[in-house]
């Protein structure tokens, strides 16, 4: 099974006091089967840009610029045509059904569906209505 990490999983590992269950899961998983989306890079960059200047912001900016791209290298997934088509269908489904799906969450769901990946997230309720295979490393 190949996996797509939602931004919340990436962020958890960088928290000052991360959830040990999530860290244990990340340590145990075969990293060659773990992918991230460019949407996570956008979401993380936005979050860092909104932080006040300081050591934490600088450390996270360095992690995003250097560590993350090195760690995931060829496993950073772009929004290609297949993802875009799935995204369009998902956003239409969201609107028709009245079940909210944010633009970024739509890209995570579309990437998981287009690439046949299990989406690893804490926010399973946000994705469950859209047919995405999900895993919650928090075990909730």
Enumerate the language-model features and the residues they cover.
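Acidic, PIN/NYN-like endoribonuclease modules and their adjacent C-terminal/linker elements
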Residues: 1-2, 109-140
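Short, well-structured N-terminal submotif of metal-dependent ribonuclease cores
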Residues: 1-40, 49-66, 125, 140
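Residues that scaffold the ATP/ADP-binding catalytic core of kinase and kinase-like folds
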Residues: 12-13, 25, 47, 87-90, ...
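Short, conserved clusters of charged catalytic residues that mark active-site
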Residues: 17-21, 103, 119
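Active-site neighborhoods of divalent-metal-dependent phosphate/nucleic-acid chemistry enzymes
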Residues: 46-54, 70-118
